[in-house]
């Protein structure tokens, strides 16, 4: 409908880290997706490491991770970032439930999961890199650096989630908001769609670049 002949996604097309076709050969969904792309006839460039490794978006022109810069911009937290990773923030004291609601509203989510103390007054916020089951370092870091709230892309019940819940029950005022991986990174790709034409210089003049949001990964069935 847009007439585009290049799609720039952030994550792999075929559900594995190296985007290997061999491991999914014969899979019905893989075959259908390939047929759809072949019928379309355009090109796909997976832009993952490039935008994470640094693009000149900071106010001083320095290189920053474009994905998390875009997240900070979407949340109106550019001025609250602790450093140029844009993964740690010092925000005005905010009740955890209010922060979760703000996240849902600003990212356009269907909802989110809140773990721990919903009444915690959140100041120190962090987006952990990944929570995938071997999370001793992350638990130690939350404790030693006095992190009030983590905004998790992935979440494992038997490690960080259990720790956050115990800390909250012991009155330590900690919480976690599980926003989802794609939901947290989508704003960075939206940011790229505005930056890309300028980055191309004269070649980008008049180039139509359209951001197409993925939409929330999750649907919620409530009690």
Regions found by a protein language model. Give the residues of each.
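Active-site catalytic microenvironments in core metabolic enzymes, especially phosphate/sugar-handling
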Residues: 1-223
């Amino acid at each position: 409908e847009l007439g585009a002949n290049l799609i720039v996604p952030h994550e792999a097309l075929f559900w594995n880290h190296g985007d290997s076709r061999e491991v999914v050969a014969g899979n019905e969904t893989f075959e259908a997706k390939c047929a759809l792309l072949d019928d379309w006839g355009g090109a796909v460039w997976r832009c993952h490491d490039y935008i994470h490794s640094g693009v000149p978006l900071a106010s001083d022109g320095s290189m920053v991770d474009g994905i998390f810069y875009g997240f900070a911009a979407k949340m109106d937290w550019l001025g609250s970032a602790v450093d140029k990773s844009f993964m740690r923030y010092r925000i005005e004291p905010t009740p955890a439930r209010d922060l979760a609601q703000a996240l849902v509203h600003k990212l356009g989510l269907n909802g989110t999961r809140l773990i721990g103390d919903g009444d915690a007054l959140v100041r120190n916020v962090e987006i952990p890199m990944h929570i995938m089951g071997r999370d001793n370092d992350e638990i130690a870091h939350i404790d030693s650096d006095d992190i009030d709230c983590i905004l998790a892309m992935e979440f494992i019940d038997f490690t960080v989630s259990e720790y956050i819940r115990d800390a909250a029950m012991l009155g330590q005022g900690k919480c976690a908001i599980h926003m989802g991986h794609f939901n947290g990174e989508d704003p960075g790709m939206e940011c790229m769609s505005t930056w890309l034409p300028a980055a191309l210089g004269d070649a980008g003049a008049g180039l139509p670049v359209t951001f197409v949001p993925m939409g929330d990964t999750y649907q919620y069935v409530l009690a």
